[in-house]
Amino acid sequence: MPKRGNRRRRGGTGGSGGGRGGRGGSRGRGGGRRTPSGANRGRHPSRGNKNRSPRTITQYGDLMDDDNIFIPKTMSEVASNMGRRKYGGMFEEIEYTESHQEDLMSRQLRNRPVEFVKAKEVYDPNVILYKLAKLNNKDDGIDIAVQSISLDDSENESSTNKVDISSSEEIEESGDEYEDEQDDEDDWDEEELHNEITTKLEALEEAMNNVSSDTESEQSVSHIEEEDEKVESHIPEPDLSAEVDEPLQEIDESENENQMESEVGTNTNTQDIETLDIIIDLPSNKVESHMSHSLPQKFKTPSSPDDDNDDNNNNSTPESEPEYGYLEEDYEFDVSKIEVSNVRFGIENQYHIKCMELTGSIDEYIWIDENDVIEYVLDNGVKEHRLNKFLSFITKGMIDEQEPEPEPEVYISDSNSEEEEEEEDDYNSEQDDYPYDSDDNLEDLIAYSKTSTQGLIPFEDRDFSNNIPSKKRQTFDHLDFDDDGELQDSLIRQLNNYKANKKLKKHQWEQQKLEESILHHDMLIKYPVSLHIKDIKSEFDQLLKDESRQSMSFPTLDTHGHKTIKNLADCYHMSVIKSGKQGIRKYLKIVKNKATFKYYPNYERINRILRGRPIFHRIDQKPQHKKGEKSKSKSSRGDASSSRARFKEGDIVGAEAPEIGSSNLGRQMLEKLGWIQGQGLGVDGNKGINEPILAKVKTSKTGIK
């Protein structure tokens, strides 16, 4: 008997993988991984180098690529230490990288990192303008103030023109300064330029004041104009009135040119004035105010009385209030917070509003009172005097401002005579207006009563049995066309043509519908009543050969028919899908699958199915009987319909029936009981009626009348 311990260590010699319950180094409970050298050590000892590592066999796959090119061992070790990915080939790595790039590009722009780089220099367009003016400048007499003007960032400046009046000596000095500063143009500072501009402007204002104090008469003005005409040969002097009235046009021209030319002519008089054009970037309102203060009264164009009247009229008539959104104060409230889709008026006006703060939801519209809306809007920045414009803005034309319609002029009479006349007219209109006393149209009424077959029978009780439908009408004998035979023949001819054309159109429509069903493979129209087993097989063959079609649907059949279709689908290796509702509307849909293109159909089993049930009727359509069968079913009672009497409207039932003769057994029995012709049935004191109750035929209505 072997020991228990030997049995536990059974298979321990199989290698390092043998453990508790292990057998020959296999993976057991507690057994390790089976190594290639330990499992067969006892039976088949390994050949060659016994000290090689267990990975040497698996390294050949790492050392060889797809083209069987040797890769050194160091490179394989580096590759094994790299991040392990599921892709090993180069093309797969490229696809892996491109997929990550697509993920990166699909992210939103605001989630991407953005780097801001500080510029080395501050961009100043005035430097570029100055250099361009310097290159284009060819005259030496340009004033230094023209080139030394720069934009001030603290003020929103717009260019306009000003008049510089100074003496000839100052102009010469400015020319010298320009020559000196032309050498040191690169060393200028903005503060120095600003100070120099202010000094020039102060000198300009002083000169203007001196001119206004010295020249008070009109002669001085004319003298100045003469001096200006002398200077016009060198520089065109702009009109002062045009400068004041239309500053923006000259501003654009001055900016496009980027230079101003001013040349000075000397004069012996101390009061000689020479004009200089200076461009200063200032806002339009500041320019106008500066020009109004700097120019004296004599330089201002005299205003006509018409202009004064126009100004007074403009001041007297207030301007219309602008729409909401044209004022700065309108932007204190965010209009996108509120959206109105409808408005309704009543005791309390309401708005159909979508607003997060009012309704508590982002996408839901709720009816809210107008007072609540106004209170919310005023609290969030809308001014009270702009409230009406705001409400009209958010409604967006939902409220149509209708012009008041003029009230119709109503005539009010002093007496009640007109009211009495109107009452009489209403009373007369309710009565019958036919003049019964007159003899008009009396002959027509008499002729109608003579020709009418039904006499004075009411319209409800008249006979309309002669109104035969057109599809059942064959002749027009019921009409009074005895005298005119040609008219009756033409009507019959037209009726026959109508029936023939209608039958032909119906046949053409059915043929067209059948062709379309065949073209679109619609079995509901192709097989209106039933399907043959050969038709089902041909449909499967057409679906198998047609590459453009992937499925087809059969009409609703009985359970055995559906089972037959499933068996044929298995033979053609196609799948079956049950579609429609349970019952009459349930049908089968055949769909191709992968096996359809891999395997051939099982024609042996198909032939066995073809030898089975041949015809399968549709259960969603009623069976159509043939015309012969239909006539037999109606005339199965001994042709009672052919001999049945036909009655007209108002005929008395049994009026033309013959009297029961004395040979009748029933009459003989009554006579034996004491009945005499002309008397009622029964004993004395309890006899019945002498005449029978009349029964009239009623075809237009049902019921008893």
UniProtKB/Swiss-Prot annotation:
Basic and acidic residues bias (residue ranges): 194-203
Statement: the UniProt record of this protein carries the keyword Nucleus: yes
GO CC annotation: cytoplasm; nucleus
Keywords noted in UniProt: Cytoplasm, mRNA processing, mRNA splicing, Nucleus
Biased composition (Gly residues): 12-29
Domain G-patch: 662-705
CDD domains: R3H_G-patch
Stretches with biased composition (Polar residues): 152-163, 209-222, 261-272
Entries under PROSITE patterns matching the protein: G_PATCH
Localization of this protein: Cytoplasm; Nucleus
UniProt record, GO biological process: mRNA processing; RNA splicing
Ranges of biased composition (kind: Basic residues): 1-11, 41-53, 624-635
Coiled-coil features, chain-numbered ranges: none
Main location per the UniProt record: cytoplasm
Compositional bias annotation for Acidic residues: 167-193, 240-260, 416-439
GO function term, MF aspect, one: nucleic acid binding
InterPro entries: G_patch_dom, R3H_G-patch, Splicing_assoc_domain
R3H domain boundaries: 530-594
Segments for region (Disordered): 1-61, 152-272, 287-325, 398-439, 616-648
Role according to the record: May be involved in splicing.
Entry similarity comment: Belongs to the SQS1 family.
Descriptive protein name: Protein SQS1
